[in-house]
Amino acid sequence: MANKKNIYIGLMTGTSIDAIDAVAVRFLNNSIDLIGTKTYQFQTETVKSIRSLCQLESVSLNQYSELDNDLGKLFAEAVRELMDLHDLQPSQICAIGCHGQTVKHHPNNDKMGFSIQLGNPNILACLLYTSDAADDVV
């Protein structure tokens, strides 16, 4: 069984809004070993919800929060599928890195730039009983 401190999972989605890409890697001595990958396809309704939110100038807190939580659950499901595929247990995972799904990105507006990602990292950590690292910037 692998040392818990050596296995990390990374999650990424892109502007194509089609899927979550997941990777599991093991850090050992001075090497990085690929354990495996998994692509988790978004359902059509999820894609529509994300695209809709990306295009709106004004969004209700309920709409934002519901999609944030839904994506947190989907990220957790993608991790579970990856772990099942490669016989990994939550106790083996040191951390999960998740950037989230970008829905607004304005790096150079008149004030200070900003970027907003969805995919509630608290839900991800709770559902998987592990630590996560998120750069949820609002």
Model-assigned labels for residue ranges:
Residues 24-31, 108-122:
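A glycine- and small-aliphatic-rich helix-loop capping segment at beta-alpha/alpha-beta transitions
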Residues 61-118:
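Short beta-strand-loop/turn "lid" adjacent to the catalytic site in phosphate-handling enzymes
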